[in-house]
């Protein structure tokens, strides 16, 4: 944003101070919103980690960043035979830097051949949602095809264990954001590799916002230094975990690889309540002792997420976790310490996944337009989601569709229109079972189908699906 006139800046600073005073008068802003988050931990299973690191050759991709630097320090404490960081930029601290870019398969192959890793941690990615929207092709090449290059290099080199750091944003069934979409395709490939028989055990973690490496805290600090902090809005929240939780998750995923379902991930149990960015900014401003103004810039592309109610399980049969969706919730499991929670990822048939990746690659080869590359990326995610849902229990699909699209809580037409792609992919996956000759005719299910038909009919472009849902209730009505 352009610099503000001095008078405007002074007015914002005065208004911000008055807002902070008012909130303190209500008993708010008394504690650092991040203090509790920074104290949380995931119990490190040190003995099991040591058995898989001591005396072995370890390679970290993207190890020059915040998480990678802390991870390398921890790995070094377990006395590996060698520690290599494959990254485009040099690092400080432990290990040897191997300059390389995971987008280049030849570079990745050469580095793996030269260093002969036995353990791999794959962290390299375009990790900021806003940046991914600005560098669409680079995000796809890095997060999607770079991950494929790492998987193939692990296979060729006979790596024993490989751990991938995914994102909690992958709990979304579908997305219209480049970052989430690219990471979902990376997850799908990693899980496919985990299911396949081969020399490598593939394991995965899902992170949420890592405090010490986070965009929000950094932008607030930078704004305080200039006297003006920009926020997306007054009522924005985000889940957080700390660097200790993130790195312990990675090491524990290595230690436990092979002890749970291969196509699963680990996350931290204790993520606390989401942090309000306005309260965080006001607390940090007060702590600085400087005159600082606040302004709301609006939610940029990549961060404008809407909550689809069917994303989470409302049955009360499973524990709620913000990084586990309703498809994954029934598969939950925990580690012995109770500080990690895991779940399985929906299976995409390998042929369908490969076909989606091939079509995406073909689209990238024929266009230089970011908007067209993004469209192809989102379509690939839709194809993978549709193929994954095709193998799911119809009753579960109906349950999720009911939670997300039933008239009681579906929201207005505009809200429903936003979720049309998600509703469509679930409805299309469910219909073959509903239209089968032996389809269940329980009154409760039929009532839900009739109600859903009404919801679908209200969404532009879904009239045909609504008609098919309505038709599924007719045999019972006739009886």
Report residues per predicted region:
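Mid/C-terminal beta-alpha module of Rossmann-like enzyme folds, strongest
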Residues: 256-356
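Active-site Tyr-X1-5-Lys
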Residues: 176-205, 213-225
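Conserved Rossmann-fold NAD(P)-dependent oxidoreductase catalytic core, especially the SDR/UDP-sugar
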Residues: 134-137, 141, 145-187, 202-203
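A conserved pocket-lining segment of Rossmann-fold NAD(P)-dependent short-chain dehydrogenase/reductase
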Residues: 132, 219-248, 252-274, 294-306
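NAD(P)H-binding glycine-rich loop region in Rossmannoid oxidoreductase-like domains
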Residues: 102-142, 173
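N-terminal Rossmann NAD(P)H-binding glycine-rich loop of SDR-like oxidoreductase domains
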Residues: 50-78
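Non-catalytic terminal and boundary segments that flank Rossmann-like NAD(P)-dependent oxidoreductase
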Residues: 1-57, 371-479
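Rossmann-fold cofactor-recognition segment
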Residues: 93-105
